[in-house]
Amino acid sequence: MKKNTDSEMDQRLGYKFLVPDPKAGVFYRPLHFQYVSYSNFILHRLHEILTVKRPLLSFKNNTERIMIEISNVKVTPPDYSPIIASIKGKSYDALATFTVNIFKEVMTKEGISITKISSYEGKDSHLIKIPLLIGYGNKNPLDTAKYLVPNVIGGVFINKQSVEKVGINLVEKITTWPKFRVVKPNSFTFSFSSVSPPNVLPTRYRHYKISLDISQLEASNISSTKTFITVNIVLLSQYLSRVSLEFIRRSLSYDMPPEVVYLVNAIIDSAKRLTESITDFNIDTYINDLVEAEHIKQKSQLTINEFKYEMLHNFLPHMNYTPDQLKGFYMISLLRKFLYCIYHTSRYPDRDSMVCHRILTYGKYFETLAHDELENYIGNIRNDIMNNHKNRGTYAVNIHVLTTPGLNHAFSSLLSGKFKKSDGSYRTHPHYSWMQNISIPRSVGFYPDQVKISKMFSVRKYHPSQYLYFCSSDVPERGPQVGLVSQLSVLSSITNILTSEYLDLEKKICEYIRSYYKDDISYFETGFPITIENALVASLNPNMICDFVTDFRRRKRMGFFGNLEVGITLVRDHMNEIRINIGAGRLVRPFLVVDNGELMMDVCPELESRLDDMTFSDIQKEFPHVIEMVDIEQFTFSNVCESVQKFRMMSKDERKQYDLCDFPAEFRDGYVASSLVGINHNSGPRAILGCAQAKQAISCLSSDIRNKIDNGIHLMYPERPIVISKALETSKIAANCFGQHVTIALMSYKGINQEDGIIIKKQFIQRGGLDIVTAKKHQVEIPLENFNNKERDRSNAYSKLESNGLVRLNAFLESGDAMARNISSRTLEDDFARDNQISFDVSEKYTDMYKSRVERVQVELTDKVKVRVLTMKERRPILGDKFTTRTSQKGTVAYIADETELPYDENGITPDVIINSTSIFSRKTISMLIEVILTAAYSAKPYNNKGENRPVCFPSSNETSIDTYMQFAKQCYEHSNPKLSDEELSDKIFCEKILYDPETDKPYASKVFFGPIYYLRLRHLTQDKATVRCRGKKTKLIRQANEGRKRGGGIKFGEMERDCLIAHGAANTITEVLKDSEEDYQDVYVCENCGDIAAQIKGINTCLRCSKLNLSPLLTKIDTTHVSKVFLTQMNARGVKVKLDFERRPPSFYKPLDKVDLKPSFLA
């Protein structure tokens, strides 16, 4: 539709990122980061975690030790493909095996002697079963074959029930920036976490808190529960860094506002007063005394030297191999941020900012669980050895303990929605459609439980840090997840890195930093600290920071470090720090590079001519300075121009202020929002509603629908959308379809299509329009003896069963039909009975309102008979079914009209769907009209000038004016029919037609908007929701209809329903519904003296209250409802007396009637 001009080079570069890049191993861009994350875990990280050699127990001053060694870790892929697994109803797991050796080391004069205690060579087929992530095209990390099946989505797990599941990515609780908090006026805390690098196993966590109270500056302490002493932060920094207090004062005061300098002087002076209050103060003695006091307080079994080494050596685990002096300087840099944040809180990243968080991807979930369960496994072995030694006097391990690592249970819980016992839920979803299985693995969410508990969270508001990296439209509009779940934009991904790559990258960066002159990277007093993953490595001369960052970024883009996703952030604003991030879990996306006021895209004239033949990785190699991968922290502290158009309108001096430039607006949407059209032309809420509805749209048939026993609703005759965006095409959503093209008319039809009501043509339905097939899984478990029992009396429920007790293939199940034999029998203890065996049917029945055909039946025989039945049903649109356009113009079928009842145009064409025209004005969905215009224009000219079929590009968010699209439609019509008059051309462009009344065959007075559009059928189907019934089961307590459509439940007749009938004055109806039915009728006797309901004792009605007082009151029989009696009984049980009183009226007397004389009048 558009020409590839220089002004649209940014759009073409953005498209290059979305398409597959086989040279870089990217076959499916939307979920590539999930595939890499999981493959890193199962191919590398699992081996690193399970390979262990460490002491379990030590005796006699470490001269005797019980050791455990786990080795020979092997991961074996399954013998079959994911398709076969789903057909069989099996889980799709890889098998991990290892060897465990437990031995005793004794240190002797001759050396170390080793005595074997126990060993286990894990060859059990169920030792560790790891659910495999199935990638696009049924790929998995252990299968080198890459066969791509167009309609097989990736990013799912298959669990035992053969339900493919996907889950969102949770935000880690640990923040990379310390969390600032105002405890009370003039009292603040600064808490941070320190986590050991990935090469240190098991992972060590430490959580520290710096407290500061303006009224007690001497108590400005750092503390950590049971892992560190409580000590003055200034004195600890002095102890570690070995510098004077004046050095610390100058370091904290450098480049700080006057108010912060005043607080710095006060803190340093308070630390001086603290030292002066102690006679002959020595910093080493002071720290040693605190360590000894903590040793006594904790009652540690370690010696004082071991305790001190353990505490100080493990201080700041993320700087594990760093000298204490650098740890001291790191604490000074933290204190700088803390003091600055007290006065300028708004300039510091808050705890809800995505700058502070890393994100857990699928591989990280399994990695975390493997860590935790391995520690539990080793702990169980240790406890078992101690118990055996205590009870039997031998070092032995039960084989049961060795063969149950516990990982299987943890992994199965993960797919059920439970991540860790102490953490929030991991939201999982069944596999239904293409849209869901792209959007959910790309969703990022906070722990709902954590947000509920903590009062500090404000994440429910759209946080500024989410801009550009998250889709602003695809967010939950209701429910507990509002504001907690966000969708990544199409350009965003999450970083992954192997441990070996991490160490090599860290080494290269450190070598680069140390290549600078030694004095320039040792400005620890007034320089800019350089940190790699929060670990301090140097402090740079302030005069060199700009050159350092610019050179580092250039080298990064050129591949000098071997990783293009390294993040380097220059934090100015008095906090003065250069942060280099290389870890996993960071949000990254590409940006256009601006260098010295020039957009580097414009400096490369060869780029435009070669772009069509290049992949994204080719651009990064051959034109490295055009695009840079930037993480969210670097983006937040950089100057980024909103668009190329705005950048080019600026002056030269203004351009030099920018570091990066963004891509067009369409790349800020997620993949779900990209399936919509022109959301920037509509009102804001339409975008949010449109995303929610698009995920509910029924898509085309997925693989093996007739074989695998799984739930699903599938479109039978799908069509590829004509009006699409590039993201919709590259993600394969367009190719796999989620709707059909229908002809619509915007008009009123006899007042039937009011509000959301739509009219749909009967012949359109009969021809398969928006026809779907429902696949439904029914699963029952039957005790073996019940399944083998024979029925004594013929039951209609068993009419569809074969002689083997299973439902017949191709049988049509109706409501009440059994799917398998389940007969319970009981023996009567009656010696005189001729047949003391009774049996009754307890089978689960088919409960759906519609008939379904049996497609597949599976049986598993164990202690129980597990029967799984797959039923299929073609379901055409009926009254009440829900539909929508891609602009959130939802509609419900209000009337199915025959073709003869519908208006027609001059060619006799009638609309398939009639939509209320006022909905366009009330919902302001202009882009719906544009979509109809572009779809109609495509029908006039479906091929480009080269004779190739080309869809129309109408991105979800675009900066193209409506006039441009009108001009495109005009050119299409002029090309196909150049002889059109201006009026005819205008009518065709704007899809205006004269329709004729079917009753009079006369044209309507005004033209009607009439044209094709892509229409979606939603999952909300009438027959799946209908629960109204006239007769059926009732609950025993309240005798109302039981709940749940699956259990054959109905709608309760409650207060609101009663009030509606009262409003209409339908007294007899209320009496009939609430009282006169057989089940609800209840006779009770009421005491006229106290108002209690009489009790029945030995068949005699007695008022208990009055009988104790030796009274003999009158009992009156009344008829009431059972619910009323239950209510009164429950109120009495809670100590509330409800008295039933009778209305007492005085007797009425009438005057005597006048006498009537019956004599004939002539006698009178």
Swiss-Prot record:
Keywords: DNA-directed RNA polymerase, Metal-binding, Nucleotidyltransferase, Transcription, Transferase, Virion. One of its GO terms (molecular function) is ribonucleoside binding. Its EC number is 2.7.7.6. It is found in: Virion. InterPro entries: DNA-dir_RNA_pol_su2, DNA-dir_RNAP_su2_dom, DNA-dir_RNAP_su2_hyb_sf, RNA_pol_132_poxvirus, RNA_pol_bsu_CS, RNA_pol_Rpb2_3, RNA_pol_Rpb2_5, RNA_pol_Rpb2_7. It catalyses: RNA(n) + a ribonucleoside 5'-triphosphate = RNA(n+1) + diphosphate. The keyword Translocase does not apply. The keyword Nucleotidyltransferase applies. Pfam families: RNA_pol_Rpb2_3, RNA_pol_Rpb2_5, RNA_pol_Rpb2_6, RNA_pol_Rpb2_7, rpo132. Belongs to the RNA polymerase beta chain family. PANTHER family: DNA-DIRECTED RNA POLYMERASE I SUBUNIT 2. The DNA-dependent RNA polymerase used for intermediate and late genes expression consists of eight subunits (147) kDa, (133) kDa, (35) kDa, (30) kDa, (22) kDa, (19) kDa, (18) kDa and (7) kDa totalling more than 500 kDa in mass. The same holoenzyme, with the addition of the transcription-specificity factor RAP94, is used for early gene expression. Part of the DNA-dependent RNA polymerase which catalyzes the transcription of viral DNA into RNA using the four ribonucleoside triphosphates as substrates. Responsible for the transcription of early, intermediate and late genes. DNA-dependent RNA polymerase associates with the early transcription factor (ETF), itself composed of D6 and A7, thereby allowing the early genes transcription. Late transcription, and probably also intermediate transcription, require newly synthesized RNA polymerase. This is DNA-directed RNA polymerase 132 kDa polypeptide. It comes from Cowpox virus (strain Brighton Red) (CPV).
